[in-house]
């Protein structure tokens, strides 16, 4: 896990945001606001072969850990790929393995 300061632009694809909202019930703008407010932790995406260069934010939404994979674009913008709930990270969070700063 690592902590980083976000002092940059954060964006997502509006079309993908609709899919995420319908499929997972997650509002990408709420996720974006949590990240901009510094309320997150982070980790690497484990499958770098399938997702080269991706990392992920870990944010708490309604008390549950959500993974938010992202890439950093050439201009330094953080581009959020998707968002999903994670039982694995929720368990690790509950066990105190990392902290999401509120």
Question: What annotation goes with each model-predicted range?
Answer:
Residues 1-102:
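Ribonuclease/tRNase effector modules and their secretory precursors
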């Amino acid at each position: 896990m690592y902590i980083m300061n976000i002092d940059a632009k954060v964006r997502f694809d509006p079309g993908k945001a609709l899919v995420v909202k319908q499929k997972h019930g997650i509002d990408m703008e709420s996720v974006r606001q949590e990240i901009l407010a510094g309320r997150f932790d982070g980790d690497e995406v484990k499958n770098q072969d399938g997702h080269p260069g991706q990392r992920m934010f870990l944010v708490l939404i309604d008390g549950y850990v959500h993974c938010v994979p992202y890439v950093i674009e050439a201009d330094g913008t953080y581009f959020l790929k998707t968002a999903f709930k994670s039982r694995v990270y929720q368990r690790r969070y509950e066990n105190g393995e990392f902290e999401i700063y509120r």
